[in-house]
Amino acid sequence: MKRKIIAISLFLYIPLSNADNWESITKSYYTGFAMSKTVESKDQDGKTVRKEVITQADLTTACNDAKASAQDVFNQMKLTFSGIWPDSQFRLVTGDTCVYNGSPSEKTESWSIRAQVEGDMQRSVPDEEPSEQTPEEICEAKPPIDGVFNNVSKGDEGGFYINYNGCEYEATGVTVCQNDGTVCASSAWKPTGYVPESGESSSSPVKDGDTGGTGEGGSDTGGDTGGGDTGGGSTGGDTGGSTGGGSTGGGSTGGSTGKSLTKEDVTAAIHDASPSIGDAVKDSLTEDNDQNDNQKKADEQSAKASASVSDAISDGMRGVGNFVDDLGGESSQYGIGNSEMDLSVSLAKGQLGIDLEGHGSAWESFLNDGALRPSIPSGHGCTDFVMFQGSVYQLDIGCDKLGDIKSVLSWVMYCLTFWYVFQSATSLLRKGEQ
């Protein structure tokens, strides 16, 4: 029996210990109403008596209605809460009982009792326990390193990568590599977050002489003591040895095949690359200054548009001048030469027989004072404007007031007409610039 109690206790403890905490989002009171019902009965005299009754069952129904109202609001708000807290669960907590502003009773008139219940909308708050980092996250969080490394691999996009301490690093910043690309020095090896597989070769930092081989004619001890630089024999080197030495095993051949990257090599490479780096930065951050070309092109377009407008105005002025000026010729005040209007008049006279000076011709239908300046209708005078004549609310507007209103409306029409003409002219100019 004791084991069963312990097992049950553990079963209850485990889920409760991992349960989320709940916090309140909003609290409100929700209402339901119990309306009185008419009950008819007979008194001692046999007369019908009507009473308005509210029972305890009605109060229970009103309380359930209040809880249902709270549930409806919660269902609607849950969508909003999910957008704000996507990782939380939501619940509605209501009281077991409602608060009433009355008690079951009977009255002679219709009446009601209000039932209120408190509703608390809550959300779950997960326990803030730090999760264990994955190997990728551990690698990505490591700081950048610098230095010279061996076993460098080249990526498909041309980048250089190393496998160091179980994490992959990419060469950034200034990078210098040997001809074969297996040994590189970089000012910043940054972790990529990738964890190499167990079968991939690892990289290690390289010191002066660590990557040197035996060179030509070197011995087994050539690597750690300088390889090509000190190659040759068992104790050979640039100065030669008692058994190996010489130009072949020592300086010339051994140095060219086993030399590692040194600080001086990196410094020299950076010095040589500095001019090209500066030019590349300049080309990336600057662009050709074509402001003068754009300004010149804009000025040319403006000049062409202005010339077109000026020619059109001059042509129209010459046509009107030749029509109204009897003298014409060089003494004309409106310019010398024919206009498009003159050519149209000549064409009408030559092909259609319409003469400008002919009486009864088609010209007279529009080239006369009435056609050029048509008279505006003047109406039939002015009379007072009367509304609701003969009633208490009769309204009289005299002719003087009507004249003022007419003047104001005329001025408004003049302004609108001027604005329309101005807009039309400017739109033509804009089209000319385009």
UniProtKB/Swiss-Prot annotation:
An annotated GO cellular component: membrane
Location(s) in or outside the cell: Virion; Host membrane
Residue ranges of the region described as CT: 252-434
Function according to Swiss-Prot or TrEMBL: Plays essential roles both in the penetration of the viral genome into the bacterial host via pilus retraction and in the extrusion process. During the initial step of infection, G3P mediates adsorption of the phage to its primary receptor, the tip of host I-pilus. Attachment of the phage causes pilus retraction bringing the viral particle into close proximity of the host cell inner membrane. Subsequent interaction with the host entry receptor tolA induces penetration of the viral DNA into the host cytoplasm.
Domain topic, free-text comment: Consists of 3 domains (N1/D1, N2/D2, and CT), a glycine-rich repeats and a C-terminal transmembrane segment. The N2 domain interacts with the I pilus, whereas the N1 domain forms a complex with the C-terminal domain of tolA.
Subunit structure, as described in the record: Interacts with G6P; this interaction is required for proper integration of G3P and G6P into the virion. Interacts with G8P. Interacts with the tip of the host pilus. Interacts (via N-terminus) with host TolA.
Designated name of the protein: Attachment protein G3P
Organism of derivation: Enterobacteria phage I2-2
